[in-house]
Amino acid sequence: MKNMKQCEKLEKRKRELENWIRKAYDATGNSIIEGYRAHFKRWKKTYPIEFQIKTIRKGGAFPKVSVLVDSMFMAELKNRILTSGHDLDEIRGDLIFDVSRGGERYVKLNGEEQGAKAGDVLLRDGEGLLATVLFGPARRTSITPETRNVLYLAWCPYGIGEELIRGHLEDIRSNLELAYETLEVGIGIYV
């Protein structure tokens, strides 16, 4: 599938989701948010989705990046589940989730080099880091206008049930279906 800049049906769903976040969304006492807060707090960092939700509640809007990115971001804010998207064709070798020993380095989406923090969760392939929970995905496997095959990963704290994770990934699929007539989708949950 060809990554598109935007899709009118997806833009309409964005406006609906923005309205829901502004009018009906309540993050008070949310166990998903609390799980992420606990992880980020260890490093005196804040859970980025919480900030993004507050921005929309104050009148902000979803950005227009591309259909492959926007579909993921919408599901992230709806479900509060941190997700990374990767160009599957740029991944080299096996994927390995691990806990950082500290100092592993990679280049983030913004082009800055970043060292992983000891104890953070990371993902790597045969060439190096693809993402960390604290600092996000690497530029090397980022979704670009040329991306044809995408891998979405939900980064979940302990305690989020499989049903919620599967529902989150199905929301991404549903968003993509607004733009693409045919999709080849596989959903797997690995703990």
Where do the model's predicted regions map?
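Non-transmembrane, aqueous-exposed alpha-helical and coiled segments at domain scale
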Residues: M1-V191
